[in-house]
């Protein structure tokens, strides 16, 4: 991983990642690229002052965003899958397809259902119709799923 100061659209032969150091989605994208031994350039954006080139490429304005040749990938799970398919270490060969499917299912549950409930609990004052305890309890389903997986 090479940190760069700007995006160079003429240099598309090396994957380029718009990232943010503390974003968990960007972290897992970087980890997958590194784990797959893919050399890439990373540009750490400032969330309060997003570069216009970044917004031109991905109007959604969220990180991570990977650019390689003419392809733009703006979801961390898709960047992870791209990295493991393209990487020289062929990480997929380490796992059975069933294990990959289980992992992807857990990631999706985390990113969608659990994150929604966790945000409601974290910002409970925005949800006055539910008690903080009820909001907390709504997060437990995911922890129970993880607990069952760990018991296997």
Question: What function would you assign to each model-found segment?
Answer:
Residues 1-144, 151:
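GST-like domain detector, emphasizing the conserved glutathione-binding G-site
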């Amino acid at each position: 991983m090479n940190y760069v100061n700007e995006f160079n659209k003429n240099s598309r032969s090396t994957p380029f990642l718009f990232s943010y150091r503390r974003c968990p989605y960007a972290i897992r994208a970087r980890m997958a690229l590194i784990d797959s031994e893919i050399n890439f350039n990373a540009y750490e954006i400032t969330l309060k002052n997003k570069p216009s080139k970044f917004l031109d490429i991905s109007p959604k304005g969220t990180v991570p965003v990977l650019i390689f040749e003419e392809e733009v990938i703006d979801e961390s799970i898709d960047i992870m899958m791209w990295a493991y398919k393209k990487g020289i270490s062929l990480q997929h060969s380490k796992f059975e397809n069933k294990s990959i499917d289980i992992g992807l299912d857990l990631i999706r549950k985390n990113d969608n259902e659990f994150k929604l409930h966790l945000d409601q609990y974290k910002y409970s004052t925005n949800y006055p119709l539910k008690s903080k305890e009820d909001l907390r309890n709504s997060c437990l389903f995911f922890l129970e799923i993880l607990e069952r997986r760990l018991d296997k």
